Amino acid sequence: MDGRDWLYCDYVHSVINNKNCLVDMKKAEIKLNVTLDEQNIPESIDWSSTDGETTDQMPAKAMFLALWDAQYKNSLRIDLWTKDMPYDEMKRFFYETLQTLGDTFQRASGGDEMAEKVIGDLRDYCAHFAEKMEVLEEGA
């Protein structure tokens, strides 16, 4: 199966290449807890996962959550950062997020030639962004 084949599962039934099959699917849960101040600005963000190295709550200073709404064919997004997220860390967070979006798209494209070219353009932009925003340390 290449990256363009879609796997849809509801944790009991799967549809693979439009064929129904019964499989025993593993289930994992990701929990997000956001503490807000009086103006609804995040004070803290904590997350945990039942499928990680630890199930303990882990702190985070920022998060970007994107979901695809298949019914309406659009993205649903939640972008949050805490009051104490330093600007330099936010620049690095954006840079790393852009880089990993390219990695994800590359895996999803299944080696599509046009996608590879576009990913190359994204990598070039990431390098430009890092330089202009002084994200990377010298020699890194």
Spans of features found by a protein language model:
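Active-site- and interface-proximal helix/loop "cap" or "latch" segments in soluble metabolic
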Residues: 43-109
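Compositionally biased, intrinsically disordered low-complexity regions enriched in proline and serine
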Residues: 9-14, 18-19, 88, 94, ...
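C-terminal charged interaction modules
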Residues: 102-140
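Short amphipathic alpha-helical patches
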Residues: 40, 86-91, 124-129
